[in-house]
From Swiss-Prot:
Sites bearing Phosphoserine, chain numbering: S263
High-level lineage: Eukaryota, Metazoa, Chordata, Craniata, Vertebrata
Location in the cell: Cytoplasm
GO terms of biological process kind: cellular response to heat; protein folding; protein stabilization
Region annotation Disordered: where it falls in the sequence: 227-285
Amino-acid positions noted as binding ATP in the UniProt annotation, renumbered to this chain: N51, D93, K112, F138
Family under the similarity heading: Belongs to the heat shock protein 90 family.
InterPro entries on file: HATPase_C_sf, Heat_shock_protein_90_CS, Hsp90_fam, Hsp90_N, Ribosomal_Su5_D2-typ_SF
PROSITE patterns hit by this protein: HSP90 (PS00298)
Protein name: Heat shock protein HSP 90-alpha A2
Subunit (UniProt): Homodimer.
Comp. bias (Basic and acidic residues): 247-258
UniProt source species: Homo sapiens
């Protein structure tokens, strides 16, 4: 483990924050990503979702031999949470998570074998979208974020938080915030000119374009408003009831019981006079974005013509039925499965 560049003496009750320097090649890569203009910055979301999918694959594979691995969370999913007020976009998965050592090594101090090769490719004019092929896709977050916070929980370790504004160093600390059963939360603090990635339609567009066939559900959480009709005096309802109760108690002591035959009519008239007004009420809307599943992985005998048709329409945005489909696989030195549609 690398030596810390800073030691902070703090009281035991405060969080201990450790600061580490980025490995030289990673620092150069981040500088290149931040300071070079790229038109297709949207690929950051594809890469982070792909990382989440890989983490979910890992915990799923481990659970095949040890089902108790999922005791910290049975559901395997990815959530996308835009927050316009805080100007953050959060990607949450219930994957394998990272230990403290994973955070330090994987996100900064040990360069991947493809780091240098990717930098050379970028400088030679390669497209930034190739970043995932070189094992450094996490750093694509800095295409749109000025600061990134990673909160993670692995079954074998405590919950930790990693944070960096790409200034040559990053911090790691024990996280005492909201508890995670298991998984990773990547919080992107977006740049002022990148807030388009907080818009519901923009996120849906990117997921459909790049991540539609991810094997785990991707759910978008969006805060919305709806109109709620309330009466003018609804907010004062409690006070009115208390006053009425006090009045009734006082009258019951001072007067004999007399039936008021006109009280019902007066009450009905009073209710009819109450005016209604509309107020805005906020709620969180949840929508699964990748309902189209990779049907080529299934047995062709189990797939109906309707399922083939729905898959083709979602993939091509065509409203007409396809003419024919061929679903086949090849096994040998090279193995693959394929779907061939004739429109």
């Amino acid at each position: 483990m690398p030596e810390e560049t800073q030691t902070q003496d703090q009281p035991m009750e405060e969080e201990e924050v450790e600061t580490f320097a980025f490995q030289a090649e990673i620092a150069q890569l981040m500088s290149l990503i931040i300071n070079t203009f790229y038109s297709n910055k949207e690929i950051f979301l594809r890469e982070l979702i792909s990382n989440s999918s890989d983490a979910l694959d890992k915990i799923w594979y481990e659970s095949l031999t040890d089902p108790s691995k999922l005791d910290s969370g049975k559901e395997l999913h990815i959530n996308l949470i835009p927050n316009k007020q805080d100007q953050t976009l959060t990607i949450v998965d219930t994957g394998i998570g990272m230990t403290k050592a994973d955070l330090i090594n994987n996100l900064g101090t040990i360069a991947k074998s493809g780091t240098k090769a990717f930098m050379e490719a970028l400088q030679a004019g390669a497209d930034i979208s190739m970043i995932g092929q070189f094992g450094v896709s996490f750093y694509s977050a800095y295409l749109v974020a000025e600061k990134v916070t990673v909160i993670t929980k692995h079954n074998d370790d405590e919950q930790y938080a990693w944070e960096s504004s790409a200034g040559g160093s990053f911090t790691v600390r024990t996280d005492t915030g909201e508890r995670m059963g298991r998984g990773t939360k990547v919080i992107l603090h977006l740049k002022e000119d990148q807030t388009e990635y907080l818009e519901e339609q923009r996120i849906k567009e990117i997921v459909k374009k790049h991540s539609q066939l991810i094997g785990y559900p991707i759910t978008l959480f969006v805060e919305k408003e709806c109109d709620k009709e309330v009466s003018d005096d609804e907010t004062e309802e409690k006070e009115d009831k208390e006053e009425e109760k006090e009045k009734e108690e006082k009258e019951s002591k001072d007067k004999p019981e007399i039936e008021d035959v006109g009280s019902d009519e007066e009450e009905e008239k009073k209710d009819g006079d109450k005016k209604k007004k509309k107020t805005k009420e906020k709620y969180i809307d949840q929508e699964e974005l990748n309902k189209t599943k990779p049907i080529w992985t299934r047995n062709p005998d189990d797939i109906t013509n309707e399922e083939y048709g729905e898959f083709c329409k979602n993939l091509t945005n065509d409203w007409e039925d396809h003419l024919a489909v061929k679903h086949f696989s090849v096994e040998g030195q090279l193995e693959f499965r394929a779907l061939l549609f004739v429109p």
